[in-house]
Swiss-Prot record:
Protein name: DNA repair protein RadA
Stored CDD domains: RadA_SMS_N
Domain notes: Has a putative N-terminal zinc-finger, a middle region with homology to RecA with ATPase motifs including the RadA KNRFG motif, while the C-terminus is homologous to Lon protease.
Enzyme class: hydrolase
Keyword hit for Zinc-finger: yes
Chain residues that bind ATP: G91, D92, P93, G94, I95, G96, K97, S98
GO aspect biological process, one term: recombinational repair
PANTHER family noted in UniProt: DNA REPAIR PROTEIN RADA, DNA REPAIR PROTEIN RADA-LIKE PROTEIN
Length: 448
């Protein structure tokens, strides 16, 4: 016998409470507490059915992957889509998630995989107009406008065996009749996503869930969907910039940290197969305060431009700002430069930016940042065709970094023949300038 209970849940963070309150005690948000019905069962073991165990034998075949016509997507996924997998694609509203998903299911992919595009945000006519604008109109892709979970499951059951891939755009618009809370709340998102993922795994179909992120970059509040799915992808970019980056943050069938680069155009998303060349295109030489960093994103080497600007300040605490880089790490590099080579910027405002709207999390970018700061402070350009990579310790030493050969190969391919890196890399080529300390960098750049 089941017993119906009620509790109160925060629509922002998912925290539950037995009583209503005006403010969530966990996240502090006001007016976010809503009532939710909970069905509990005290005799779960009695109503359950016995399941047979299986042994983890060596007779296991590799997962069959389905290659898509979007090579950058395949790179991020680890080689293609896996049957029975659940994939979550998050990103800001309007960043291009729907465009990417429509290009996937309505392109040449639809001729070999039976696809269903379910929209909860747009009407069918809007989807058709967007497909017409992107030149994706075909008679192979099925589309459905639905907001109710039960209707979606019933439609999938009625077409069982005729669907290989399902797109839900977006999960925030789907609701179940079992809950009284409105669509988009934590309980609705969690319940609907759980049911859809379970259905996909039981029927060995691929499901892609589109999900908006909140202001602080979280998926539907407390990232409550990430543990439900096999793969989590984030679509990153700036609305004022035409570059888009698809990055993997979780992948049970491939590597984490892989990126795919796209360019947004009037005809949709265009793959960028050589992002280093694109990000450095039409770049002027001998620009003061700029340095090229040879980075690694996942398994892909990528050259990025680091820009620094230093201006005098009358403020007691001059401003330090960083776009695309950790501002706390910038403060650390400034402290090391001041302590180890006497570059005191205490009375200057410091601004750092990564060109192209990219974000760098690698410690190996320390050396490029330091070089750009020295160039901006001394008002001298860096040597032409130079590339930097290396981690800087608090003592000012330049540490060894991973995948140095791949970084150097990418730099040489694009015409950069002056590689400045750590001496501990043990590389003796003529085009490599090995340094052990920031003092060596200062001498190499000819700063006084």
């Amino acid at each position: 016998m089941t017993k119906e209970k009620k509790h109160y849940i925060c629509s922002n963070c998912g925290n539950t409470s037995p009583k209503w309150s005006g403010q969530c005690f966990d996240c502090g948000v006001w007016g976010s507490i809503i009532e939710e019905k909970v069905i509990s069962n005290k005799n779960i073991a009695k109503i359950g059915s016995k399941q047979d165990f299986e042994q983890l034998s060596s007779n296991v075949t590799d997962q069959v992957r389905i290659s898509t016509p979007i090579g950058e997507l395949d790179r991020v996924l680890g080689g293609g889509l896996v049957l029975g997998s659940a994939i979550l694609i998050g990103g800001d509203p309007g960043i291009g998630k729907s465009t990417l998903l429509l290009q996937l299911v309505a392109g040449s992919f639809a001729s070999k995989v039976k696809c269903l595009y379910i929209t909860g945000e747009e009407s069918l006519d809007q989807i058709k107009l967007r497909a017409l604008r992107l030149d994706l109109v075909n008679d192979k892709t099925n589309i459905l406008a639905a907001n109710n979970l039960e209707d979606i499951i019933a439609s999938l059951e009625a077409n069982k065996g005729n669907i290989d891939l399902v797109v839900i755009d977006s999960i925030q618009t789907i609701a179940t009749r079992e809950l009284t809370s409105p669509p988009g709340t934590v309980s609705q998102i969690r319940t609907c996503a759980h049911e859809l993922v379970n259905y996909a795994k039981q029927n060995n179909i691929i499901i892609l869930l589109s999900c908006h992120v909140t202001k602080d970059g979280q998926l539907a509040g407390p990232k409550l969907l990430e543990h439900l799915v096999d793969t989590v992808l984030y679509f990153e970019g700036d609305h004022n910039n035409h570059f888009r980056i698809l990055r993997s943050y979780k992948n049970r069938f491939g590597g984490v940290g892989e990126i795919g680069v796209f360019e947004m155009s009037s005809s949709g998303l265009i793959e960028v197969t050589n992002p280093s060349e694109l990000f450095l295109m039409k770049r002027e030489q001998n620009v003061i305060g700029t340095a090229i960093f040879a980075g690694i994103e996942g398994s892909r080497p990528l050259l990025m431009e680091v820009q620094a600007l230093i201006v005098p300040s009358n403020m007691v605490t001059p401003r330090r700002s960083a776009v695309g880089w950790d501002v706390n790490r910038l403060s650390m590099i400034l402290a090391v430069l001041s302590s180890r080579i006497g570059l005191n910027l205490a009375n200057y405002e410091v601004y750092l930016s990564i060109a192209g709207g990219l974000k760098i999390n690698e410690p190996a970018s320390d050396l490029a940042v330091a070089a750009s700061l020295i160039s901006a402070a001394t008002n001298k350009p860096l040597p032409e065709h130079s590339v930097f990579f290396g981690e800087i310790s608090l003592s000012g030493e330049i540490r060894k970094t991973a995948k140095a050969e791949a970084r150097i190969k990418e730099a040489l391919k694009l015409g950069f023949n002056n590689i400045i890196c750590s001496k501990s890399e043990n590389l003796t080529h003529d085009f490599i300038s090995s340094i052990a300390h920031l003092k060596d960098l200062k001498l190499l750049l000819g700063s006084s």
